[in-house]
């Protein structure tokens, strides 16, 4: 096989007159009046190859037998296309290759779908034939971008003096967080390793070890319910550093992300990134990861409506809840009564018991609850919401968390439906000053908002075991276009604080020692102040590539039900394998 001289997509007018050897796949073959044209594709693009009997009759005869997705080697000369033959849709559209020789390296069955962008095919079929799906130029380009993003992160961290250190994939299962993927031990029957949800504890131990600056591009595993921006296995840009403030860690993160966006998209992002406290994010946007590319902010109108004779509002306020509203500017005409009923059904998915609404027409409030607003109250409400003719006012009344969840989700939905979002914009945001704990209704107790190793604010440490709800954390999340792309914090580095943290989470001293004794021991040997952040590589690439599902950024992903249609994983194993591991499967009885 002759050595390749160029990639197909690299050929241009500078190559005219040059002899080239190309390897690739046949994208398309056309037979036109004794001439055969082949579009040859490789990872860099497509070029047109012409087979002319006057130039090589033998090559023409072989080309006649070629079909789509055959793998071939072509030797020929680069020529300029005629003016009328120029194809502006191709990067190589001003040139073509006049073939002298063609060698068929392998044939191909007819693929189950066309290998081209925009093909209408189910996700299940794409994943079953993922190796064909990845041939499509748009998929190829995503993985070029992923390579660029990964390389840029690595180069930046190397330049900043971070050590790339690997941590083990076979670790110990620990509570808190999502479910672990467990790996049975053959040597110790009945015992299990866990695949890491993150290298959190181990990277902290590397700080105890004195490495000062660590990073790793690491695969993580979480057995959790899936959605478009989650996968059971995913990749993090993970870093940890000693003796730095959280502001310094944030500055490093910003520098990396600015470089990544410049390299991947050739877009310049201003820094420092805007900052917002967790409380402000929840109050204004109903989300701890707000998309700040558009408005539709939530406005608390409890004080305005507390005296109106509408029982839904009154009841919510009397029971310690609140009433908030969104003003969808100039959107009243966009929504019929049926549309508004559908929005009510939508917010019910987030716990809301309903969605009240008003429209502003000719200076007056119109709608089912307009009768509860006398002129003075109507004027006050319009002023508080800056409402004008044509505006649509949407209200939720309930406990604060339900109001935030329902109106926050509604805000995102309306942002898309009303075309308020500039899809080309990249809006980074730091969300800071998080509560250390959040209340888990199902468990009936407080759990870590991030993880049990997050450092409380110094002034709140005395409250850890007495008033958990008031403790604030030295934590920070980085958000991009409404997606959390990273989370970080300063870490607990003193044993007595970590012990207090575990007690606040409901651990006995004995259970904490059993689960985390190795960490507690390390904290007695001069662990330095340290902190870090983990950035979601797959999610960053998804956003930069303009996709809406993580599957498109992972070479061999799982479906929404955590199945791999390509390999049919997960699958059963043999009785012999189970016996070797001292395991039995429990069969469900059927009637």
Swiss-Prot record:
Keywords: Aminoacyl-tRNA synthetase, ATP-binding, Cytoplasm, Ligase, Nucleotide-binding, Protein biosynthesis
Catalytic activity: tRNA(Asp) + L-aspartate + ATP = L-aspartyl-tRNA(Asp) + AMP + diphosphate
Residues reported to bind L-aspartate: 176, 222, 450, 491
Keyword Nucleotide-binding: yes
GO molecular function, one term: catalytic activity, acting on a protein
InterPro entries: Aa-tRNA-synt_II (IPR004364), aa-tRNA-synth_II (IPR006195), aa-tRNA-synth_II/BPL/LPL (IPR045864), Asp-tRNA-ligase_1 (IPR004524), Asp-tRNA-ligase_1_N (IPR047089), Asp/Asn-tRNA-synth_IIb (IPR002312), AspRS_core (IPR047090), GAD-like_sf (IPR004115)
Protein name: Aspartate--tRNA ligase
Primary gene name: aspS
């Amino acid at each position: 096989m002759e050595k390749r001289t160029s990639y197909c997509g690299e050929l241009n007018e500078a190559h005219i007159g040059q002899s080239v050897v190309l390897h690739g796949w046949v994208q398309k073959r056309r037979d036109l009046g004794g001439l055969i044209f082949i579009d040859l594709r490789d990872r860099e693009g497509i070029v047109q190859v012409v087979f002319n009997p006057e130039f090589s009759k033998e090559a023409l005869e072989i080309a006649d037998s070629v079909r789509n997705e055959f793998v071939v080697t072509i030797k020929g000369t680069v020529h300029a296309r005629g003016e009328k033959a120029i194809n502006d849709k191709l990067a190589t559209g001003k040139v073509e290759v006049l073939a002298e020789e063609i060698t068929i390296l392998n044939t191909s069955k007819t693929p189950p779908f066309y290998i081209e962008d925009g093909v209408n095919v189910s996700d299940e079929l794409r994943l079953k034939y993922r190796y064909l799906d990845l041939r499509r130029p748009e998929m190829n380009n995503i993985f070029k971008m992923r390579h660029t993003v990964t390389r840029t992160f690595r180069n930046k961290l190397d330049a900043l003096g971070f050590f790339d250190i690997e941590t083990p994939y076979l670790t110990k299962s620990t509570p808190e967080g999502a479910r672990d993927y467990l790996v049975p031990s053959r040597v110790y029957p009945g015992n299990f390793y866990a695949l890491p949800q993150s290298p959190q504890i181990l990277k902290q131990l590397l700080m105890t070890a004195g490495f000062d600056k660590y990073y790793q591009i690491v695969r993580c595993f979480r057995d959790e319910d899936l959605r478009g921006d989650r996968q059971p296995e995913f990749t993090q840009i993970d870093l940890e550093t000693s003796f730095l403030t959280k502001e310094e860690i944030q500055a490093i993160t910003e520098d990396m992300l600015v470089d990544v966006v410049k390299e991947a998209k050739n877009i310049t992002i201003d820094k420092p990134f805007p900052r917002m406290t967790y409380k402000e994010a929840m109050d204004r946007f109903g989300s701890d990861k707000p998309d700040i590319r558009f408005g539709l902010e939530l406005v608390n109108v409890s004080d305005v409506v507390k005296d109106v004779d509408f029982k839904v509002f009154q009841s919510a306020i009397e029971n310690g809840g609140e009433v908030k509203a969104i003003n969808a500017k100039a959107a009243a005409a966009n929504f019929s009564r049926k549309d508004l009923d559908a929005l009510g059904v939508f917010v019910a998915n987030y716990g809301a018991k309903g969605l009240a609404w008003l429209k502003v027409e000719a200076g007056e409030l119109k709608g089912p609850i307009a009768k509860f607003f006398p002129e003075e109250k109507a004027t006050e409400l319009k002023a508080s919401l800056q409402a004008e003719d044509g505006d649509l006012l949407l209200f939720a009344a309930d406990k604060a968390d339900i109001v935030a969840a329902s109106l926050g989700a509604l805000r995102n939905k309306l942002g898309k439906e009303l075309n308020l979002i500039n899809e080309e914009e990249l809006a980074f945001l730091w969300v800071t000053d998080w509560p250390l704990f959040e209340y888990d209704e199902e468990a009936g107790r407080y759990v870590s908002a991030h993880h049990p190793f997050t450092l409380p604010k110094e002034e709140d440490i005395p409250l850890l075991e007495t008033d958990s709800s008031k403790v604030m954390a030295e934590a920070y999340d980085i958000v991009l276009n409404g997606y959390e792309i990273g989370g970080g914090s300063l870490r607990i580095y003193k044993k007595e604080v970590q012990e207090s943290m575990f007690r606040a989470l409901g651990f006995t001293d004995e259970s904490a020692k059993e689960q985390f004794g190795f960490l507690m021991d390390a904290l007695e040997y001069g662990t330095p102040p340290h902190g870090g952040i983990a950035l979601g590589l797959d999610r960053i690439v998804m956003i930069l590539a303009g996709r809406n599902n993580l599957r498109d950024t992972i070479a061999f992903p799982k479906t929404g039900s955590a199945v791999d249609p390509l390999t049919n994983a997960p699958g059963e194993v043999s009785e012999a394998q189970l016996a070797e591991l001292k395991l039995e499967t429990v069969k469900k009885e059927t009637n």
